[in-house]
Amino acid sequence: MFGKSRQSSHGRTSFVDKRVATKIFIEAFEYSYTNTNAISMDKTDEFDFIKPALKPLPDARPPSLLANVMNERKRKLQNTNSTAKCLLPAPPPQLRKLEKKNHLLPLFSL
């Protein structure tokens, strides 16, 4: 459509040709986008981001299994925290010192 691009003596496309091709591509893309995806700025009902998100209303359904498990864990943690005292870990057992005995025999005997 636009013909071959000009090449310099080294066989590379010139910088100006690349810029022109880029501008043509961008203009063609913008033209295609505006014709196929026309956006009217007067209709903002679908994209009104200023309204705060509302918290969903609680349902009349019974709590889910996950909620039951989490509540059970909370109760157990509260019960163990109130009844258990902070216990220090047991001290490590005392290590007895081993007497060093030399049980080596001479390698050569005369």
Curated annotation (Swiss-Prot):
It comes from the Viruses. Pfam families: DUF816. This is Uncharacterized 12.5 kDa protein in HE65-PK2 intergenic region. It comes from Autographa californica nuclear polyhedrosis virus (AcMNPV).
